[in-house]
Every structure is written in structure tokens, then in C-alpha cells.
Amino acid sequence: MKRTFQPHNRKRRNKHGFRQRMATKTGRKIISSRRAKGRHSLSVSSDMGSRRQ
């Protein structure tokens, strides 16, 4: 049987990336709360940027 999680980096970035978070009010709240907590990575795309060419 096929598993439900089929990972793809593009889909991951598009759904949970920084630009996607900033597009909604609740997304901005998530980013600000992660900043306040002192998270090393704010979103998926923010730590993918260095690896992507």
C-alpha cells in the first residue's frame, strides 16, 4: 500500500515557506512567535535557501 507522505522539497517550500507564511495574518503570527522564542529557523524555506541553487 502506498504511504501518504511523499516528500517533495518544492511542495514543502510552497506550503510552509516564508513567503507563504507572510501571505496570511496567522502565518505572520507564526513567524513572529518563532522570532520571539528565538528559533534558529523561522520557516522551511529560510533554511533551504543556502542549499538551493
Curated annotation (Swiss-Prot):
Taxonomy, superkingdom: Bacteria
Bias (Polar residues): 42-53
Entry keyword Translocase: no
GO CC aspect terms: ribonucleoprotein complex; ribosome
GO BP terms in the entry: translation
Disordered as annotated region, ranges: 1-53
A Pfam family assignment: Ribosomal_L34
Entry keywords, A to Z: Ribonucleoprotein, Ribosomal protein
MF GO annotations: structural constituent of ribosome
Keyword Phosphoprotein listed: no
InterPro entries reported for this sequence: Ribosomal_bL34, Ribosomal_bL34_CS
Family designation: Belongs to the bacterial ribosomal protein bL34 family.
Name the UniProt record assigns to this protein: Large ribosomal subunit protein bL34
